[in-house]
């Protein structure tokens, strides 16, 4: 029977999983329905659908891993299951980060005005460039996750069953270091790309603001508003990633830390917040998704009001 801490963990993870899958599933459903309706799909919709699907996979594998850890700890002795979880987790995590960086790059190319020939060429070829980046992100995530599947890494973390199931960590320095580098590679580059996008957007905004001040209009134009929305979106992602990434590093190093099981439980709860909460930020930042979300809320509110029993 789960302890009090384990019961709290299960409740929190189940709640976060429900919210996260609902939010990301809503993004996929609305964009796919619009795609079928118009028989056409925009570049931003492709990015959002790819990101939402990767987030759903990430949420599922984190939650399943946590439930297996608590309810069926003996399954960690199954190398096949461990291999599948490791590969899917690595792929979903890396693809989620890379697709988010694609979103930041899209904001940069779509909104920023930078007087450089290469940047101007990227803006002209934005559809081809972004599709190439999306495909490259998928392939990079796939290569990293497949390369991670090696029997030598099973020595990093192993659960052995004696009279009672106990946690036993057997660390091999060389394989562990290599695994750590592989796991973390997928997070550093997207983070750097988002930072670059943020600073270039900020530079473009400052430059645009100076031009507005020269004309002394005194009002914000649509370009300024677009800059501000894009910068806010990138800042929110960076803040969430700053919380998510260190926790992810700790989780991948939990074999080196006493009470590794408790560390993994806390890490699961924190890491699930990132893909769950960011989906609603994306919904409210996109006019089509926001309109569909508010329409759904009005429908639910009206439905609950009609079902409310009459009290004389």
Swiss-Prot record:
GO biological process: detection of chemical stimulus involved in sensory perception of bitter taste
Transmembrane segments: 10-32, 53-72, 87-109, 129-146, 181-203, 235-257, 262-284
Residues exposed to the Extracellular side: 1-9, 73-86, 147-180, 258-261
Glycosylated residue positions: 164
Record keywords: G-protein coupled receptor, Glycoprotein, Membrane, Receptor, Sensory transduction, Taste, Transducer, Transmembrane, Transmembrane helix
Subcellular localization, as worded in the UniProt entry: Membrane
GO cellular component term, pick one: membrane
Organism domain of life: Eukaryota
Anything else known: Several bitter taste receptors are expressed in a single taste receptor cell.
Name of the protein described by the UniProt record: Taste receptor type 2 member 9
Originating gene: TAS2R9
């Amino acid at each position: 029977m789960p302890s009090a801490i384990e019961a709290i963990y299960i409740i929190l993870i189940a709640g976060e999983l429900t919210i996260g899958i609902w939010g990301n599933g809503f993004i996929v459903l609305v964009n796919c329905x619009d795609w079928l309706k118009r028989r056409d799909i925009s570049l931003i919709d492709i990015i959002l659908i790819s990101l939402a699907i990767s987030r759903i996979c990430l949420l599922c594998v984190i939650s399943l891993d946590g439930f297996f850890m608590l309810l069926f700890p003996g399954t960690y002795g199954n190398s096949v299951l461990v291999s599948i979880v490791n590969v899917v987790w690595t792929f979903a995590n890396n693809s989620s980060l890379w697709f988010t960086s694609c979103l930041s790059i899209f904001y940069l190319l779509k909104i920023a005005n930078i007087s450089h020939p290469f940047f101007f060429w990227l803006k002209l070829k934005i559809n081809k460039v972004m599709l190439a980046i999306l495909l490259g992100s998928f392939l990079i995530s796939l290569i990293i996750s497949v390369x991670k599947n090696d029997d030598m890494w099973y020595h990093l973390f192993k659960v052995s069953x004696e009279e009672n199931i106990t946690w036993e960590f057997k660390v091999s320095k060389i394989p562990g270091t290599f695994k750590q580098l592989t796991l973390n590679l997928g997070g550093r580059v997207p983070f750097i790309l988002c930072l670059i996008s943020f600073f270039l957007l900020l530079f473009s905004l400052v430059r645009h603001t100076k031009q507005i001040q020269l004309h002394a209009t005194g009002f914000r134009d649509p370009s300024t508003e677009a800059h501000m929305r894009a910068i806010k979106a990138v800042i929110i992602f960076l803040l969430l990633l700053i919380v998510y990434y260190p926790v992810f590093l700790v989780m991948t190093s939990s074999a080196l830390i006493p009470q590794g099981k408790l560390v993994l439980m806390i890490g699961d709860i924190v890491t699930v917040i990132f893909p769950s909460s960011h989906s609603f930020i994306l919904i409210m930042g996109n006019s089509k998704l926001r309109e569909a979300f508010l329409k759904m809320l009005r429908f639910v509110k009206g439905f609950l009001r009609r079902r409310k029993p009459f009290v004389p």
